[in-house]
Amino acid sequence: MIFKNAYVYDEKQSFIKKALFTHESSIVNKEQHSSCDHIFDLADHWLIPGLCDIHLHGAVGGDFSDADPACVKKILRYEAQEGISNVCAATMTLPEEQIKKIMRIISDYKVSDDEASLAGIYMEGPFIAASKCGAQDPAYIKDPDLNFLKRCNELSGHKIKFVTVAPEIATACDFIKEASKQMRVCIAHTNCNYEQAAEAFRHGAMQLTHAFNAMPAFLSRSPGPLAAGFDYAAAAELICDGVHLHEATVRSAFKLFGLDQILMISDSMRACGLGDGEYTLGGQKVKVSGPKALLCEGSGNGTIAGSVTSLFSAMRHAVLHMRIPLSEAITAAAVNPRKALGIYPKYGILNQGSEASFTICGKWLDIKAVILRGRIIWGEEFLKEHLIRRNVACS
């Protein structure tokens, strides 16, 4: 396929108006593309690489923690239609056997053509602090346990890419030193001070899980893990749904940590893509009203319980309502997460040799069509309207 007259996000992390050529599942150059069946004139639309959500729990009624292949399928299908082509399945603080079951399900799951790819697992919990457990169930919190982590990683087929730890726990630094040899260790669900966080970063931690949330605030005389993250060049995950973070906080984070260290995430739960109502997250009841998901019982009453926003919608919100430049938002949602996973530039850029997964958007970042691994999975009617030639030579 050829897509003409579109603004394409390129290897310089900026937009250029040009034609994009695809063959099978890859992006190719004109010389490699000897013929094609379809040429589309996209008339100044935007071509954005498929996003990469490294931290989501669920969507459209499913949760990865359900350990149910049917739930995995509908989550991945929804994510693909939302312009997200790679995801990491996030777990919760749950009973050990349930966590192991999740690992086995993810290890065995085979992705279909219309589903986002599983790039790994984000193990959020159970190695967290009860004082900052948020929507995690404190009943199943564990001290950092390297043997348990190794067993989970084996069961997952070595798919664990991220693990969250609270640095103030006595055994945390020894755990971080060993775990960081195999995956990225992240800090959150913690009440640690600056010094404890700095020690964790010196031992190998390199990321802040949903920065600013479930951790101490950045105060003048007690700067906490956020300042330590800045001092040790850690990456910072941001949930840009308009609920978790004030828009000024997001803009400040981009400046404080630097664009290359910002990772946009959704942290979405099973209500994402659905409506208001009562749901569950990690076995706890959650009430969703509009853009907010809040715990509705127990000591965590009123605590934010993940988001109900896809990563693409969060990126759009950051651009349209938080004044983050589009090119920077895409870098934070498509490029940086894949660099963290070590799969860039095969994924996350619209350049020769990269995977042909991208979203066609209108002026206001409304999704018009989605191409996943070279196949049209959404927006066929839109593309039919923009089909100008078929069965022609590409000379």
Regions found by a protein language model. Give the residues of each.
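Conserved, mostly hydrophobic/aromatic
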Residues: 123, 179, 208, 318, ...
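His/Asp/Glu-enriched, well-ordered alpha-helical/loop segment
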Residues: 225-238, 254-266, 271-360
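Active-site core of metal-dependent hydrolases
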Residues: 150, 154-276
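Histidine-rich, glycine-flanked metal-binding segment
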Residues: 1-48, 393
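Active-site gating loops and adjacent loop-to-helix segments of metal-dependent hydrolytic enzymes
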Residues: 77-88, 130-157, 199-212, 222-235, ...
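C-terminal cap of metal-dependent C-N hydrolases
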Residues: 6, 339, 349-395
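Divalent metal-dependent hydrolysis catalytic cores, especially in the metallo-beta-lactamase
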Residues: 57, 73-102, 116-129, 156-168, ...
